[in-house]
Structure formats: structure tokens, C-alpha cells
Amino acid sequence: MHSWPYTSPMDALIRYFPQVDYSSCWHAMRDLTDHRDAQQSDEFWVLEHPPIFTLGQAGKPEHVLNAGEIPVVNSDRGGQVTYHGPGQTVVYLMLDIKRLGLGSRGLVSAIEQGIIDFLASLGITAVNRDDAPGVYVQGAKIASLGLRIRRGATYHGLAINRDMDLSPWHRINPCGHVDQPMTTLKAQGVDLDRHSMEQQLVSFLAKRLGLTPRTAALPDWYNTRQENVTTGGDPGSALTQQPERL
């Protein structure tokens, strides 16, 4: 994967973050989507979140069984309830789907197939399901999807379980499905370091989407947030609003 000072319309800027809070990412990717133009490159944001449950637009509070100390927020992505936490890689996809020539169904299929291709390269046989977006290994869910399309562009994206603690999943009905088993790469016998795993995943996703990945620096909103944290300021001061908590 290369880092370039210039881009073409079919380049995707890949930004690798450490652990980032959900609110900052959500509002930053929404802001990017609202202000992008037809010449702007697509972006992948690759990161982890601290523990959090998020309810999509179709989410029902009764699918949160026992949140305990883990925050629950309402999100504007599609889908039901999901969990994010350490040991899970999240890839947010800011894509111009008109430029890519994809409808919503084609987009979901391309993302799922990119994940399936990645898992196949590791010797893991995985499938998607018509009745439940995501990627599954012998019935257990290893990757989740949740997208928002606005102004011909997408944000939000996917999450794949690397080596995370699966116990928080028992506190919800994952994506609204009762007793849905979950799994991880590690449980499937794969023990890749995070950076290598993420680079490989991005490569397969970009190929399925017809994009060329170009590694890029972290964005200004993240650097500003880090400065606020370091100086004792409000890390959310650059955000327009906080998500609604349940």
C-alpha cells in the first residue's frame, strides 16, 4: 500500500487510527459526507472503539438486554443493535457510490464479498446471508455491517472481530437476532497482528469496490481532539452535538 501526495478519483485514502471514541468518529464522518464534492477522494477510516453499544435506525431498545456499565447510543446508521470494543477492527467507508456505480444492494454485496475474500485468504470459509447482513462462519457472525447513504455518498461501515472479548455480545440480541452466536479471527485459529490484518482487509475491500488504496495521514479533527485531550480541554469541543444516550 502506497502513500501519495496526490490522488485520482478512484483512489481511496486509508487512515489508520488508534482507539477513538464513537462520538468523534460519527460526527466527523457525517461532516465529511455533508461537505464533500464530486472530486473528493473516498476514504476508509480504520480503527477501534472503546466499549459501546450502538442502536441503528431500526434498533429496538428491547434488544439491549443488560447494558450494564457499557454506554448505549442511538446512531443514524442502518440496522439494529451492535457492539464495538477492543479487539475489533472497525472500517468506516466514506464512498461516492454514484461515482462507483453502485446501488445500496450492490454496495453491501461488495463489502461482504471483500470480507469473505479476506477470510478465504486466511483459510476461513465464510458466507453472507440474504436475511441478515454480515459475514458468518459456520453460523457464527464474525463481521457486521451498518451503513448510511446520504447525498449519493455513504458513511458508517463494517466491523470485524479479531480477538475481542465476546461476553458483551451476550448483553444484546446482535442485530436484533436472539441467541446469535459470535466468533473472532482468533477463535478460527488466526492470530495476526492488528496492523497486518487491517492492511490485508483494506486491500480486499478496495479491490471489490474498484478502488486503489493510498495510506494517508490522520485528519485535522483527530489531531485537534488529541490536542484537547493532552491540554485538558474538552475532546468533544469540535463536535456539533453528542449522540443521544438511552
From Swiss-Prot:
Q: Where along the sequence does the record put site: Lowers pKa of active site Cys? A: 141
Quote the Pfam families the UniProt record gives.
LplA-B_cat
Q: Which Gene3D superfamilies match?
A: Bira Bifunctional Protein, Domain 2 (3.30.930.10)
Report the main location listed first in the record: cytoplasm
Catalytic activity, EC: 2.3.1.181
Keyword Transferase part of the UniProt annotation: yes
Q: Which residues form the active site?
A: 175
Annotated region Disordered: the residues are 225-246
Q: Where does substrate bind?
A: 77-84, 144-146, 157-159
GO MF annotations in UniProt: lipoyl(octanoyl) transferase activity
Task: Answer yes or no on keyword Protein biosynthesis.
Answer: no
Going by the UniProt record, its keywords in alphabetical order are: Acyltransferase, Cytoplasm, Transferase
Q: Where in the cell?
A: Cytoplasm
Miscellaneous information on this protein: In the reaction, the free carboxyl group of octanoic acid is attached via an amide linkage to the epsilon-amino group of a specific lysine residue of lipoyl domains of lipoate-dependent enzymes.
Q: Which HAMAP family does the protein's record reference?
A: LipB
NCBIfam families given for it? lipB, PRK14342.1
Official protein name in the record: Octanoyltransferase
Q: What gene does the UniProt entry assign to this protein?
A: lipB
